[in-house]
Amino acid sequence: MVTRLDSLRAIEGADSTVIHNYSVPRRGINLYGNVITMSPEEAIQTQNCFVRAGLKGRMGQTKFEETEVVADKKIVGLHRFYYGADNKQLIVVSDTKIRYHTGSAWADIDTGQTAGKNSLITTWGALDKVFICNGTDPGVTWNGSSAADMSGTNAPAKPIQVLPYRDRLLVIDATNHGDMQWSASFSDTGKWETISACGVRPDSKLYGMILHTDNNSNQGVEAKVLLAGANGMHLFSGADLRTPSTTGDYRVESLATSVGCNAPWTMCWTPAGSMYLGRDRQVYLLPFKTNTPLPVGHKITSRHPFYTGIEKIPATQIENACAIYHDGFYKLSFAGDGQTTNTIQFWLDINHIKQDESGLYGPWYGPMVGQTVSVFANQNGPGDLGELMAGESDPTIGSFIYQLDKEGEFSDDGTSIPVYWQSFYNPLGDANLKDAIHMLELELLDTSGTLDVEFHDIDGAVNTGNTITLGGGGLYYGDTYWGEADWGVSGSIARKKLNIGKGGGGTSLLRRCSLKISYGSTTETMELYNASLKTIPQNIGFD
């Protein structure tokens, strides 16, 4: 009689093996589709990692300033203000205060704001002024040294947001249910056109606006403004803003959607078009020169029982989501299921955005965890180097400002960044038959630390507790590796092997195999190029 032990020993001694390839997930993750029919270039999860040449861990964050803006509060506004020839300030709002950084400490701009109100901050470069608005208080203007309330005849009493357009300053005023008006001239202190004279009331309420044009400019024939409404999205445009519209030539076009946006911090210009998070928890892209928003967030909308995506954003927290276009990605930060702070990010690779054969857009990467971001700000003006700044969303941590994605920073303020990739479920030839795991080979940059490796079938983990020790042959810094022996060339690419069967410590049988590779370090990150799995086919069907 042949026992199961005899069968396993026979497997150990078998010579017939098959090699299965696992490429890096260039198509990103897919939480929406059938887990069995995912593309080999898709992944179930890419936590804290993304594809750029190889699959690499994200960089970490450091505090911009060790002192809180306001003790034990969250950040509710952040902006980089450029003015004059080469002047710049970081403007921040927390609790009741608007403050700026002097270069060594936080200093007050205004201390009488309504506590905790999300603030939209905009620069009008032509006047060297920045405008801070929250929809409750009079808007505050700041020129780098002195502050004042927004003023003028018919001035908005409770501005939600301002936006320079053509030679005017547009404003959404909460006093009139979020309707729009604008300055009557090239000034913010003179006369303002009345809302009734402007006649721009496309929705029951407007929440925010951004420029919508391929060159991200408020001038030019194609320059338009995307308005976020309660019940839809709208495009405002015109070269002559004299009122009424029969005198000027401005107009409002409603887009082909009944879904609005109440999360103005998620509205972003990208080279592909304007993006935003809708009130239905879907991410939309409005390509330039079209009137039809495309839903592009399906792949981060989970239909799997063990993973969550944007579908679990609490209804009361949609308005607090935020996003930024940075380093080729649309980076979306939001609160997870049952949470009140933004703890999760997903990144859409705009440089490689594509619709797949199922009609879904990607590549998306994430979840990115370990950072609690309430609002982002790019530092991409004169004298800056494209730094990505962020405000703290969790008041129990404190009102800190961080620099994210910092070169050479491999931790989040000293906390290791947990990176892992879980691949698609490879059918290993015939998914009706079982295979025995024999050996795994990884092609990667040989930095330092330890990789944890697990093998999963669709019903759970089959083999866990495996480790691969990296040799420290390459030192990572930013986007560059240096070998230990020669700091002038890239670090070494290595092949690392893990034996499971055939003398490697046991045999595991499965029908489909998803690799889960994890890494965590405060001094390094990983960069993986390919994985190959050697299995021994069995003549064992399902039972």
Question: Where on the chain are the PLM-derived regions?
Answer:
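Beta-sheet repeat architectures centered on beta-propellers
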Residues: 2-128, 258-274, 278-543
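Beta-propeller and closely related beta-pinwheel folds
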Residues: 62-75, 110-118, 147-280, 284-320, ...
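Short beta-strand element of the conserved SAM-dependent methyltransferase core
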Residues: 92, 121, 141-142, 227, ...
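Short strand-coil-strand connectors
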Residues: 95, 103, 133-135, 144, ...
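Hydrophobic or amphipathic alpha-helical targeting/insertion segments
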Residues: 120-150
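Proline-rich low-complexity regions
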Residues: 139, 154-161, 423, 427
